[in-house]
């Protein structure tokens, strides 16, 4: 009876139904306890306990490895993000330097263009003044009779 209780009410923690011990327990009850069936049933129970123990040990190891892996993952992700930030900082610096250089070149070209335009206006004004000054007679324009005009 003790053997049947062990078989039918085994400590299988995973709450899965294992049919082999139940069938062997039923056959054992019907055959009045053969030694071979007892040995086979006890062997199966021992194997089942070993499997459940190893499963729980493997699960614990997986949890430990996952936590270490997650920690490593967090550090790796942090390093990756920092690397990307450094790369972006380099790219942004290069972009701003390029924009600054372009802006400086544009300002220089604008100032040169304005200066040339101003010089052209000044030279045009001088030329116009020279032409108008050479063509006109002061005496005729002023209407005054001066010693120079007489």
Swiss-Prot record:
Keyword Cytoplasm appears in the UniProt entry: no
What is the disulfide pattern of this chain? none
Q: Which organism is it from?
A: Rotavirus C (isolate RVC/Human/United Kingdom/Bristol/1989)
Its lineage reads: Viruses, Riboviria, Orthornavirae, Duplornaviricota, Resentoviricetes
Please identify the protein, giving its name as recorded.
Non-structural glycoprotein 4
- Note the superkingdom of the native organism: Viruses
Question: Which HAMAP family does the entry link to?
Answer: ROTA_NSP4 (MF_04091)
- List the keywords (alphabetical): Activation of host autophagy by virus, Enterotoxin, Glycoprotein, Host endoplasmic reticulum, Host membrane, Host-virus interaction, Ion channel, Ion transport, Membrane, Secreted, Signal-anchor, Toxin, Transmembrane, Transmembrane helix, Transport, Viral ion channel, Virulence
- Chief place of localization: host cell
């Amino acid at each position: 009876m003790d053997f049947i209780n062990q078989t039918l009410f085994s400590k299988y923690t995973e709450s899965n139904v294992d049919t082999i011990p139940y069938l062997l327990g039923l056959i054992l009850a019907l055959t009045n306890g053969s030694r071979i069936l007892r040995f086979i049933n006890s062997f199966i129970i021992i194997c089942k306990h070993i499997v459940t123990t190893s499963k729980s040990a493997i699960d614990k190891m997986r949890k430990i490895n996952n936590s270490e892996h997650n920690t490593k993952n967090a550090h790796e992700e942090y390093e990756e993000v920092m690397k990307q930030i450094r790369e972006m900082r380099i790219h942004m610096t290069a972009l701003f330097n390029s924009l600054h250089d372009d802006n400086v070149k544009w300002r220089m070209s604008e100032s040169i263009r304005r200066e040339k335009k101003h010089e052209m206006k000044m030279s045009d004004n001088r030329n116009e003044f020279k032409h108008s000054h050479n063509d006109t007679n002061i005496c005729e324009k002023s209407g005054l009779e001066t010693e120079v005009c007489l």
